[in-house]
């Protein structure tokens, strides 16, 4: 074997072993959480818009659909999460209707349909999600009419959306998961939700965007994973006054999250939708860990738990 061929062989072997290790690392449990986007309205090139997936076996349940959701799902599928293959995306849960959580909605509905998803999409969200859906589908009517009735001969059912406007309580249940929606406070939004997912091997609570919430403490109560939004007090201290007022009314400070986590007692706390500004991720973790001794990580796009 020539030296050049040996180098090529070793390079391919490293790639193969890396892929194998990734697949093994995500195959031990039935349930995985995949952070598809951990961003905020700030245009951070390293963080896609807010979205995460609960994947049980090979079935995915997506929470929120910020910009980039389908491409992040496609990337995760190549890392061994087969339930996130784009043509398998057909269940979506929306926490609230802020644009950073919903600008990927058309992408979520239309792109998997082009990629031959079978059957309709089930969407669960707050009051107003039906109107948003109807406007978006009307805007893209020429697109999907050509795809369905033109040379592609697309499946019309793949473009069908069943919209469910939620009320607090159990909003979805199948053989793999039960989903409980609960109200949280996010500024003046009339309806902003968090979710609790109960699967055969895990209980997972997703805060959505919110301030400190006793309801999250009740819903977690020792849950396996709590995924919670947060802002850095260090970064916050240098924000203009109008933004300080805004953030305090819409989001959860690191101090309040540490207090909440001490009472909720999750086995793992995952920081998400991190507002850091000119501070650092390390400083944010220091703020949490100074008052909370449980296991905590700062989530990044495509992290798997």
Residue ranges and their predicted role:
Residues 3, 20-205, 216, 283-305:
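Binuclear metal-dependent hydrolase catalytic cores
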Residues 5-8, 274:
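Hydrophobic alpha-helical segments, especially transmembrane helices
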Residues 7-16:
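Bacterial N-terminal signal peptides
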Residues 15, 93, 206, 270:
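Conserved Rossmann-like nucleotide-binding pocket used by diverse enzymes
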Residues 21, 194, 201-203, 211-303:
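Cap/insert and terminal regions of metallo-dependent hydrolase folds
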